[in-house]
């Protein structure tokens, strides 16, 4: 039975919007989380799921929606399905429905091909570095290439985040979007593990030292206007005359060069701010596989020289 007429007519999205607004007003979630959740809810706005009251939704309706989502990425499907399940949980709590038809329901798998990680080859990277000095985002490009930082983290850097004495960068903020999709500097990173201190390498050190000399007490890039990742992406496409290029490639390029140099996955995980090493391994599985044979030869030679053929103890 329903509690009242209003709830009896509640749709999936109306329940979800009210729930997110309530959590945000109670300071239970950050604005960046609120914005991401709202984006997931919007994928439920089109079609029968947003027309009928949730109490009238049947498994057939869910099946139709599920099928319609197959051309989206697994990430989009997963986020939308999480919101869908949440709506039915809310409806159960409010006694709007008496049975949760999604209790054991499985979401659709995406029919889209999984995009492999894109990174510059060494030749492409050299060409890009030769190209960027003329760009207004030169420093952002160089920082991303030399550290693997997300572009949102780069654009949120403050003078105080650069420690020239210790040669480190303190990553503790990012650029997020509010409920109106306007960019702002978020006082926390994308994830808990995104907050990290990374080394300022010898290539980047002299460049950034010169750049920040007149930036004391200021944000390095986002002072009068916050610079969003999409702005830098657009400029990168124009600069390279390649619509397939984006700034996340710079992060992947850094990670790829690290793997090529022999850096262990557990170290790379910390540098990139991944929460779980499986994220690092799964994201760069092809790159790790490429160098597996080389690593096997290194292990083989080590065994020969140190363990089985009279090597030093």
Region roles according to the model:
Residues 111, 175, 205, 272-298:
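Catalytic-site neighborhood detector that most strongly recognizes the C-terminal catalytic loop/helix
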Residues 78, 93, 97-99, 103-157, ...:
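Basic, Lys/Arg- and aromatic-enriched nucleic-acid-binding interface segment
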Residues 21-96, 226-231, 244-249:
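N-terminal core-binding DNA-recognition domain of tyrosine site-specific recombinases/integrases
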Residues 8-11, 15, 55, 195-235:
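Major-groove DNA-contacting interfaces characterized by cationic-aromatic clusters
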Residues 166, 177-179, 185-195, 202-204, ...:
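C-terminal secondary-structure termini that scaffold catalytic or DNA-interacting sites
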Residues 156-162, 269-275, 285:
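A short, basic/aromatic helix-end/turn motif that makes direct DNA contacts
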Residues 56-59, 89-112, 172, 297-300:
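Short, charged hinge/linker segments at domain and secondary-structure junctions
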Residues 130, 134, 147, 198, ...:
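Short, basic (Lys/Arg/His-rich) helix/loop patches that form interaction surfaces
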């Amino acid at each position: 039975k329903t509690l009242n007429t209003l709830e009896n007519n509640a749709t999936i999205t109306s329940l979800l919007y009210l729930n997110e607004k309530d959590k945000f007003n109670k300071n239970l979630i950050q604005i960046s989380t609120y914005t991401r959740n709202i984006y997931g809810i919007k994928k439920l706005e089109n079609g029968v799921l947003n027309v009928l009251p949730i109490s009238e939704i049947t498994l057939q309706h869910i099946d139709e929606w599920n099928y319609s989502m197959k051309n989206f990425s697994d990430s989009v499907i997963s986020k939308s399905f999480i919101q869908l399940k949440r709506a039915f949980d809310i409806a159960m709590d409010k006694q709007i429905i008496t049975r949760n038809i999604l209790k054991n329901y499985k979401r659709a798998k995406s029919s889209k091909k999984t995009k492999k990680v894109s990174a510059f080859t060494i030749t492409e990277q050299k060409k890009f570095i030769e190209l960027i000095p003329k760009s207004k985002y030169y420093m952002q490009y160089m920082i991303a290439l030399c550290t693997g930082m997300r572009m949102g983290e780069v654009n949120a850097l403050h003078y105080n985040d650069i420690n020239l004495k210790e040669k480190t960068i303190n990553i503790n903020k990012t650029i997020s979007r509010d409920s109106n999709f306007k960019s702002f500097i978020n006082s926390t990173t994308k994830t808990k593990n995104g907050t990290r201190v990374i080394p300022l390498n010898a290539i980047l050190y002299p460049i950034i030292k010169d750049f920040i000399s007149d930036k004391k007490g200021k944000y390095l890039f986002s002072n009068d206007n916050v610079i969003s990742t999409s702005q830098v992406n657009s400029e990168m496409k124009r600069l390279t005359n390649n619509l397939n290029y984006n700034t996340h490639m710079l992060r992947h390029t850094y990670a790829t060069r690290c793997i090529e140099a022999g850096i262990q996955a557990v170290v790379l995980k910390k540098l990139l701010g991944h929460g779980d090493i499986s994220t690092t391994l799964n994201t760069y599985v092809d790159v790790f596989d490429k160098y597996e044979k080389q690593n096997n030869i290194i292990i083989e030679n080590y065994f020969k020289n140190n363990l089985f053929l009279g090597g030093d103890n």
